[in-house]
């Protein structure tokens, strides 16, 4: 049996997850990151994507996150998300509104900000393709 550790997923609105898990896959800015017990201490930024949480009971739950930070320690992991929701609760309208807001912000944005916003639009679009059935 795999070793377990504590995982918390927190958004400004609420605590979404606080439980003992065996594995968490995080959409880190540098790429997908699998966190397991006794992971080396790391702090990373999180891009919009899906967090997969494998519980000690063997179930896997998926959450859509819209950026944030992950604090990883050997005994636990805390993900502070800008916004997060269980994928079953993700509404295509909410996602489309986020994409449209980012596109609207592109108007008149500086080159540096424009690049970040274009990347955000691409990440949100990909997130929609992953979690919302066609």
Swiss-Prot record:
Gene3D superfamilies (alphabetical): F0F1 ATP synthase delta/epsilon subunit, N-terminal
Keyword Membrane belongs to the record: yes
A Pfam cross-reference name: ATP-synt_DE_N
InterPro entries: ATP_synth_F1_dsu/esu (IPR001469), ATP_synth_F1_dsu/esu_N (IPR020546), ATPsynth_dsu/esu_N (IPR036771)
Gene: atpC
Subunit structure of this chain's protein: F-type ATPases have 2 components, CF(1) - the catalytic core - and CF(0) - the membrane proton channel. CF(1) has five subunits: alpha(3), beta(3), gamma(1), delta(1), epsilon(1). CF(0) has three main subunits: a, b and c.
MF (Gene Ontology): ATP binding; proton-transporting ATP synthase activity, rotational mechanism
Compartments reported by the entry: Cell inner membrane
Transmembrane segments: none
Organism: Sinorhizobium medicae (strain WSM419)
Family, similarity comment: Belongs to the ATPase epsilon chain family.
NCBIfam families (alphabetical): ATP_synt_epsi, PRK00571.2-4
Alphabetized UniProt keyword annotations: ATP synthesis, Cell inner membrane, Cell membrane, CF(1), Hydrogen ion transport, Ion transport, Membrane, Transport
GO cellular component: plasma membrane; proton-transporting ATP synthase complex
Protein name: ATP synthase epsilon chain
Cleavable signal peptide: none
Membrane topology type: Peripheral membrane protein
Known function: Produces ATP from ADP in the presence of a proton gradient across the membrane.
């Amino acid at each position: 049996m795999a070793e377990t550790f504590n995982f918390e997923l927190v958004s400004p609105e609420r605590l979404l997850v606080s439980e003992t898990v065996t594995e968490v896959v995080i959409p880190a800015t540098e790429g997908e990151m699998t966190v397991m017990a006794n992971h080396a201490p790391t702090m990373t930024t999180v891009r919009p994507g899906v967090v997969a949480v494998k519980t000690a009971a063997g179930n896997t739950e998926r959450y859509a996150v819209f950026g944030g930070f992950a604090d990883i320690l050997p005994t636990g992991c805390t993900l502070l998300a800008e916004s997060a929701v269980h994928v079953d609760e993700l509404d295509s309208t909410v996602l489309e509104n986020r994409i449209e807001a980012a596109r609207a912000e592109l108007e008149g944005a500086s080159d540096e900000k424009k690049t970040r916003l274009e990347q955000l639009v691409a990440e949100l679009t990909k997130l929609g393709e992953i979690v919302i059935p066609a």
